[in-house]
Design a protein with these regions (language model features):
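A beta-rich soluble binding module of mature secreted/lumenal proteins
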Residues: 2-184
């Protein structure tokens, strides 16, 4: 009887360990689809590159899905500049035939597009770390779905930011509490 109880307890511990580590596995293409497949806003919380003019950083960067297939992602991209909310429609091609699932955002007005590679996905916080190249350097970005953004708004104690820190890049914060309260 003791052997049976011991085997049962070991099985429970083993299963709990698998479930705890499941959030840290290398992300796959379905993780990318699951992350993007929401009608909520997805916020850019942290980014390693500075967006905006000198002393006028863009803030409250977000995307809201308008169409999602296994090949394409269309969305409304919004941000706040000089206290004014601005939005534009954008689209991306989704790729599963690479080491990391990719979202290739089409360029606007003749500018080249950007390839974002999903490097990390946390199912409990609904956050994702994307890698991309800018000016010949590897950069990172942390995006979070709206319903968990207040839990992951750059606090160093959560797994999302720890994964971001693995990129070993600068950290500019693009989300704050005013992003949800100010419409202009």
């Amino acid at each position: 009887m003791r052997t049976l109880v011991t085997a049962f307890c070991v099985g429970l511990i083993f299963r709990a360990n698998i479930e705890c580590n499941a959030a840290f596995d290398a992300p796959n293409f379905q993780d990318l689809i699951d992350f993007l497949n929401t009608t909520e806003r997805i916020w850019v919380v942290l980014r390693s590159t500075y967006l905006g003019e000198w002393n006028k950083q863009l803030m409250c960067l977000s995307t809201t899905m308008t169409l999602l297939t296994r090949d394409a992602y269309e969305y409304e991209y919004c941000y706040r500049k000089d206290e004014i909310r601005q939005c534009e429609n954008q689209s991306a091609i989704l790729r599963s035939d690479t080491k990391h699932p990719q979202m290739v955002v089409k360029g606007q007005g003749g500018t080249p597009g950007v390839t974002y590679r999903l490097k990390y996905f946390h199912t409990n916080y609904w956050c994702a770390i994307f890698g991309f190249r800018a000016d010949g350097k590897e950069e990172c970005e942390m995006r979070v779905q709206d319903h968990t953004v207040n839990e992951t708004s750059g606090a160093v104690t959560n797994d999302c930011e720890k994964a971001y820190d693995e990129c070993k890049v600068k950290k500019y914060k693009y989300y704050d509490d005013t992003c949800k309260t100010r419409t202009a």
